[in-house]
Swiss-Prot record:
GO biological process: one example: cobalt ion transport
EC number: 7.-.-.-
UniProt GO molecular function: ATP binding; ATP hydrolysis activity; ATPase-coupled transmembrane transporter activity
Record keywords, A-Z: ATP-binding, Cell inner membrane, Cell membrane, Cobalamin biosynthesis, Cobalt, Cobalt transport, Ion transport, Membrane, Nucleotide-binding, Translocase, Transport
Protein name (Swiss-Prot/TrEMBL): Cobalt import ATP-binding protein CbiO
Gene Ontology CC entries for this record: ATP-binding cassette (ABC) transporter complex
Assembly, per entry: Forms an energy-coupling factor (ECF) transporter complex composed of an ATP-binding protein (A component, CbiO), a transmembrane protein (T component, CbiQ) and 2 possible substrate-capture proteins (S components, CbiM and CbiN) of unknown stoichimetry.
Gene: cbiO
Enzyme class: translocase
Length: 271
């Protein structure tokens, strides 16, 4: 269980997170949305133990986080963060060594390291470029290497910061597929993103942050259909939700579902 209880965090005298009560164990994929400066990045750093709240707590397995060296090491094997810029967490020039780095530090046997690295590369669809030098990879490929580096730890929670930023449409589609495969293995994914359409499509629950507080929480369709809340948070609605709220069309979760329903309607009218 990863959650927060009355979480407060200040930078100097300025409160950034204000009494947050969040539970990320309730849904496979949880989306965090909000305008710049709402506290998403600070929340991620609190969840991973990089920052320590002045009041309240991050809860792991129902208990306040242990900030000792041993406690944080244990946490980061179960709660892994993948930053927006993959360059921040890639240190080697060859992919296998980079992904295996954390496992070797933990003293994991080489045979187990080989197995985990191979599984992680398969999961992120990176087997076909695993032998290329990292400096020759595209931005999207580097993102996949960074995710693989988190997956080898067999973390139960994966924090993804802007996973589709800088990706072309094909790369974005691949990233969605990767997230779905991670969740299919029984893991939890928490996504912070300005890609509202991504959050709507892939999340099971959404928290909307505004000035360090929770403005709204619920299922994506319910949250994003609330025009007033979206405007108050400084956000726009996903395009599929706009079609529903502004034109009265059926609310669909994905583009594929939308066009399938439209084709069925067109076929019935033509008949």
């Amino acid at each position: 269980m990863l959650a927060t209880s009355d979480l407060w965090f200040r930078y100097q005298d300025e409160p950034v997170l204000k009494g947050l009560n969040l539970d990320f164990s309730l849904s496979p994929v949880t989306g965090l949305v909000g305008a710049n400066g709402c506290g998403k990045s600070t929340l991620f750093m609190n969840l991973s133990g990089l920052l320590r709240p002045q009041k309240g707590a991050v809860l792991w397995q129902g208990k306040p986080l242990d900030y000792s060296k041993r406690g944080l090491l244990a946490l980061r094997q179960q709660v892994a963060t993948v930053f927006q810029d993959p360059e921040q967490q890639i240190f080697y020039t060859d992919i296998d060594s980079d992904i295996a780095f954390s496992l070797r530090n933990l003293g994991v046997p080489e045979a187990e390291i080989t197995r985990r690295v191979d599984e992680a590369l398969t999961l992120v669809d990176a087997q076909h470029f695993r032998h290329q030098p990292i400096q020759c990879l595209s931005h999207g490929q580097k993102k996949r290497v960074a995710i693989a580096g988190a997956l080898v730890l067999q973390a139960r929670y994966l924090l993804l910061d802007e996973p589709t930023a800088g990706l072309d449409p094909a790369g974005r589609t691949q990233m969605i597929a990767i997230i779905r495969r991670i969740v299919a293995q029984g893991n939890h994914v928490i996504i912070s993103s300005h890609d509202i359409d991504l959050i709507y499509e892939i999340s099971d629950a959404v928290y909307v942050l505004r000035q360090g507080q929770i403005l709204m929480h619920g299922a994506p369709g319910e949250v994003f259909a609330c025009t007033e809340a979206m405007e108050h948070a400084g956000l726009t609605q996903p395009w599929l939700v706009k079609l529903h709220t502004q034109l009265g069309l059926p609310l669909c979760k994905t583009e594929t579902e939308f066009f399938h329903r439209m084709q069925k309607c067109a076929f019935r009218e033509a008949s």
